[in-house]
């Protein structure tokens, strides 16, 4: 399998076949070089490496995309993180950790995006108002 095919398989495993199908439908002469770069380099060469597992790569992406305040890409990578074995509690802790290092505005936006994804997937109740996860309450003292 070449790097492009490897990348497309990893992308399918990460985001799901419907995501890749939609992306392929939007392919045109202008964006084709970027899609090829993404398939071959990002997913084929980097995500395809053995040094760290896919779950850890997803965790890194959640933190990086939160720091960069990229909600659209974060939404896709939240789906990928769940597909790679991250739990809602782990995602909550990852995003809470980013608040300290990236700031509350970036983390707040990430929490909104994550909450939407988790609700869409039925992983948190639509009407939940109680804190969840380890410790549930963060004590600022």
What are these regions, as identified by a protein language model?
Residues 100-101, 118:
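Short Asp/Glu-rich motifs
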Residues 54-59, 88-94:
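Alpha-helical scaffolds flanking conserved acidic
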Residues 67-92:
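Mid-chain, well-packed structural core segment of small domains
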